[in-house]
Regions:
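Glycine/proline-enriched, intrinsically flexible loops and inter-domain linkers
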Residues: 136-137, 143-232
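Hydrophobic alpha-helical scaffolding
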Residues: 49-56, 111, 115, 177-181
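Generic secondary-structure signature for well-ordered alpha-helical cores
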Residues: 68-75, 127-134, 146, 196
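Short pre-catalytic strand/loop immediately N-terminal to key active-site residues, enriched for Gly-Thr
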Residues: 106-109
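Internal hydrophobic alpha-helix adjacent to the cofactor/substrate pocket in enzyme cavities
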Residues: 117-139
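Glycine-rich loop(s) and the adjacent beta-strand/alpha-helix scaffold that form part
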Residues: 1-11, 136, 140-145
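Active-site lid/adjacent beta-loop-alpha segment flanking the redox-cofactor pocket in flavoenzymes
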Residues: 2-104
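Short, glycine-/Ser/Thr-/acidic-enriched flexible segments
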Residues: 24, 33-34, 101, 112-114, ...
Length: 232
């Protein structure tokens, strides 16, 4: 290490982990399947920085992937395992902006990637408070994108889904399945029987398009034209 520059961050999307230099060693951050939501009822009042029981079995596939990619990682041993909570929202985006129903109360939280968006979020929030509106369209992170449909069971299912999707490919306009269908109109079943392929907006199921004869009633996400193009 002596005389060498600091190692850059490594990311392996297939094995779903990142690795970077930390205090003279390497830190491995895996994003595993099946990570359970915690603090659904909120943390205790005296909770500050609580760590949970180590669970190396759950991390084994990611550790094996890291050793395959960086063989030296398998030779140095594990000094410490941190298993703690990380803040997530149902869609994985932070929550920045004015709170529902409260005057002069602003929210800036849900930053699951740490300080990455700190500068931009602080900048836009300051403009919002001082000037009355932000320079950038903040609709994607607005607290008001969630309504009273976002119950605790909904939040649990969607937060677990958002965490498990961090390292997979994200397609344009994809509609994720957890906690759905949640709110449906009286004609939902009729539209479904007519071939509707549904999306979700503000908790409501609504048709994105209707599958034609012989077409599977399911979207196939793509960076090009998916099957909705032929139907429409």
């Amino acid at each position: 290490k002596e005389g060498l520059p600091e190692m850059g961050v490594l990311r392996d999307s297939d094995s779903r982990w990142y690795m970077r230099e930390e205090a003279g060693g390497l830190i491995l951050g895996p994003y595993e399947d099946g990570a359970p939501a915690c603090y659904v009822e909120g943390p205790s009042k005296d909770s500050e920085y609580e760590l949970f029981q180590e669970d190396l079995d759950r991390l084994a596939p990611h550790i094996e992937g890291a050793i395959h990619r960086v063989p030296a990682f398998g030779e140095v041993g594990v000094k410490k395992v941190y298993n703690g909570a990380i803040c997530y929202t149902p869609d994985g985006n932070p929550i920045v902006g004015p709170a529902w129903g409260l005057k002069n109360f602003w929210i800036n939280e849900g930053h699951s990637f740490g300080i990455t968006a700190a500068g931009g979020a602080g900048w836009q929030l300051a403009e919002w408070i001082v000037d009355g509106e932000p320079t950038i369209d903040m609709l994607g992170v607005e607290p008001r994108r969630y309504g009273n449909y976002a119950t605790k069971s909904y939040l649990k299912a969607k937060n677990e889904e958002a965490y498990s999707h961090v390292f997979i490919v994200h397609y344009p306009d994809e509609e994720r399945p957890a906690a759905r269908p949640l709110r449906t109109s009286p004609c939902y079943e009729r539209m479904k029987n007519l071939g509707a392929v549904f999306g979700q907006k503000f908790g409501w199921e609504r048709p994105n398009f209707f599958a034609t004869d012989g077409m599977e009633q399911k979207d196939d996400w793509s960076f090009r034209r998916s099957k909705w193009f032929d139907a429409i």
